[in-house]
Amino acid sequence: MNKKMLAAGSRDEYGETLKEKQEIEQTIINVLNDQGYIPVSTPLIEQENVFDQYQEKKVFHLLDHMGEKLVLRPDLTLPIARFLAANQTTLTVTRLYYLGDVFHQIVNLSGDYNQETQAGIEIIGEQSFEAEIEALETMLAFAQRFGIVDVQVVLSDARLIDLILEQFDLDDQIRNEMKQAIEEKNISRFEQLKAQIPDFPAELADWPLAFGENGESAMEKLQRIQAVKAIMDDWIRLAEYTHRHYPDVAVTVDLAAVLPQPYYTGTIIRGFVPSLGDYLFSGGRYDRLLSKADQETVPAMGMALKVETVLADRQRDLSSLSAQDPIVVVLAKGRVEQDVRPLLKKAGVDTSQLDNPARKLVFDTADNRYRFILVKANDVVKYLDQGIGDVGIVGSDTIAEQEQNHYDVLDLQTGKAEFVLAACKDFEPEKISRLRIATKYPKLASQYFHDQGEDVELIKLEGSVELGPITGLADAIIDITQTGRTLVENHLQIFDRVGLVATHFLVRKGALLQYPDELTTVIKRLVNLVAPKEEVKE
């Protein structure tokens, strides 16, 4: 029997679960209809150029019978912008709402789903800050209506990082690299760049970690910058509104936030549910996406609610939630775990359960603050990105070959090695029209040769890569070495040094909002421990 199977990343919806989802959707429709929002529906399939701002790897691409390039929509705001541009008469103050599915490419064999349902509002033509307040009120009212008890509001702004960096005399490359390091919470790179900036302000010394209480503390000191003060005044208005109308909802700020969507231009508002480790809603101001016939831009504010998050909250047993859920640390078994254990202990993490692991793979600390899971190196990122783990510790060689849906926070300076290009001593690449390169790391090798401007044939090996040149399978290899001894024993020599390898400290994106105090404390301690001695902070 030729059984028909689901495509990877997809799922069927059925029975009681689907009925619950339909009830949620109908409630949203009824509420927004009653509030006077106008429904709008756009096609699942759009012209490719509607999503020019999206990264290629995130979008499903299609071709029609004429060869026209199409995509499955990964977003619902951009199709609405396309609709409004085609119907110029609607570009007055207009309140629209939508309910539909969006599609995203996922990492192969990751276990993720590529389709989710969103309900959202778009407030078009409203320049005043009342649009932000209305959008926040709409989302918080839904959270209250659906009984989501632990939502917290996280405020950020698309302009903030650029406005602060403008205060320094930086060339474009340093400015762009600094912004990227801040948004990606890459503290190792941030520290390197910060050292190049004289008189860097103390209140931003830990800028990638400037969220939650750390962000609020830095926020107070940054109000001396007039443009920043205006942003923070708006945040205060939103916080005061929330506290007045929803006193049980916490409000915090993120001074290091990456843009949820590339078209945002101002205030960004997100609703995070710590116990689920996921966002309930997200949105912001986008004042340059729409324009009238005379090219005058049209202000707009939009917010999207994740229907699956509402459903997940409804289906769980709230009485089983524990305020003491441990932080889950996923460790690569073997040398990585052994080398990093003393460092974690010095940072205040109880690692005693790892001292005599026997055959166990899961360990809880006595105080229930941490849970350790030991896995193979290649599986660390999967556990992290699927929400099983909060922290991942693994070598950068493994990270380099996998998709990144987490923060690569810190180089722990353990497990040091390097990637090298090696071959037999008579290797003469200039005499070979197209090199054959054997490696366990095709992604890294491909990038290396791309940067060199060379076209090569890569051969993926799982075992002893050194055999490639010896047997004639390959002309050279890209592999890891610590001492170079294995290369020498196999009569190979190093022709180029490709990059460094070390153990890295990764954090799941939602974990920093779930456990802000504990994780930022540990991260800061680790920063001090791995810093050169003369740079160690008091």
Q: PLM ranges: what are they?
A:
Residues 17-31, 46-47, 79-89, 98-146, ...:
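Positively charged, Gly/Ser-enriched RNA/tRNA-binding surfaces
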Residues 50, 56-102, 106, 380, ...:
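Glycine-rich, N-terminal phosphate-binding loop and its surrounding beta-alpha-beta segment
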Residues 150-160, 178, 252-258, 459-465:
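Short, surface-exposed recognition loops or helix-turn segments adjacent to catalytic cores
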Residues 321-538:
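Domain-level signature for soluble enzymes in the chorismate/prephenate branch of the shikimate pathway
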